[in-house]
Amino acid sequence: LKNSSLLPHVNAGTLTKEEINKLKPVTASMGMMLENTSRRLTKKGMPHYACPDKVPIQRIRTMDNMGILRIPFTTGILVGIGETWQERIETLQAIQNSHLKFGHIQEVIVQNFVPKQDIKMKFYPKPKHNDFLKTIALARLILSPDISIQAPPNLSLEHPEYLKVGLNDWGGISPITKDFINPENKWPIIKDLNNASKLMGYSLKERLTVYPKFQNEKDGFLHQHIRTKMELLSCDNGLAKEQYIQ
């Protein structure tokens, strides 16, 4: 905050209220993938077995605490790890229920599972493209209109089709750094992504890590340290003052 123009976004997994409060003065927004609310997926032989940080009730509690403490929040669902359609629906409903109570969720990421060589599920198949499109559409139908729907454009060459079924945000795409979660999948070139979006009737606009609706001083979503910095970086409409694509 002192030495750069960056606005920190923290993704630290499950956090207590005390930890969230400690981070708020130096954090613009926070995030944590809910992934799935199914207890079945935590049983032996399933993807979340022996992962105490991924016990659904712990993640739901963190998500709710973010709302109680007025944190602009990002969460999401992981698609293709052995979950059923009913479990996908219940996960999206849990996110919606939290947002209805606290109004703090900025965006929901619909992320497709990608097998990696160093994990136990390395031979597990990727989710089918049509199933993934249906899940994005499902998210758009279940979640409030003020929640953005996001999906990573670097995990599928068919990503422009996401715009047909409800996606309205591509997430963070860097021309400088790699995707540290999926380093084997390069970010698309931003101008190419803009051209692909234009073919679908859209154009890219650069935003800050805090969406415009959460920048209202009266709502208490931002600490004054963050607000002061954000005012230097945002336009009157709340988007980034400097746009990568003019």
Please report, for each region that a protein language model flagged, where it lies by residue.
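Core AdoMet radical
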Residues: 1-66, 72-75, 79-81, 99-111, ...
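Auxiliary Fe-S-binding modules of radical SAM enzymes
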Residues: 3-4, 89-246
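Short Asp/Glu-rich motifs
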Residues: 19-20, 41-43, 84-86, 181-183, ...
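Conserved phosphate-coordination/catalytic loops
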Residues: 53, 57, 86, 126, ...
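Short histidine/acidic/glycine/proline-rich micro-motifs that form metal-
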Residues: 79-82, 178-180
